[in-house]
Regions:
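A structural "domain/chain start" motif
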Residues: 1-47, 147-159
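C-terminal/domain-edge helix-coil "capping" segments
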Residues: 1-9, 70, 104-159
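Extracytoplasmic/secreted envelope proteins and their assembly/folding machinery
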Residues: 29, 33, 37, 61-65, ...
Length: 159
């Protein structure tokens, strides 16, 4: 089947980070994209990356389709990474991270979304918060790709 072999080009935006603290954005982006590329290298998908971050909760369809068009992408993923503060330190976060993703087609239609809560999944959270971001991102991508596989290829939506 010729359709199966087609490499899907997926455009990833920078994750929106909650709480909105400059200091944690850089490490979050790094951990997020490292998990994405680890994940996609095993698959026939190509990661495209834009340094743009758009609000997870108010996504404009036209913006998505413009980005997909300009980057020749088949899909777009808008991620969000939510941290939980613990203790009274300025940047003391627990290992619990929720990674949310919304998957859009090239026209900017929402196909599916998922939340991956590292705490709820009862992962034995060892190590750093960065590690949790990777685990969460990995989990969220797997969910999204599972959904993606359920979508039947049909001529008109270009899969």
């Amino acid at each position: 089947n010729n359709h199966e072999a087609k490499i899907k080009r997926i455009l990833y935006f920078n994750p929106q980070v909650e709480p909105d603290i400059e200091e944690i954005k850089e490490p979050t982006n790094t951990a997020f994209f490292s998990a994405v590329s680890d994940n996609l290298s095993e698959r026939k998908n190509k990661m495209l990356k834009t340094e743009t971050q758009i609000s997870f909760d108010s996504i404009d369809q036209k913006t998505i389709s413009d980005y997909c068009l300009n980057n020749d992408a088949d899909f777009a993923v808008i991620p969000k990474v939510k941290y939980f503060k613990v203790g009274i330190g300025k940047y003391v976060f627990s290992n619990q991270v929720i990674v949310s993703m919304k998957l859009f087609d090239a026209e900017g239609n929402l196909i599916t979304e998922t939340d991956y809560d590292t705490y709820r999944k009862n992962m034995r959270l060892l190590g750093s918060t960065v590690n949790s971001v990777k685990i969460g991102t990995d989990g969220a991508i797997k969910e999204i790709l599972k959904q993606l596989r359920k979508i039947k290829p049909s001529g008109e939506n270009g899969f």
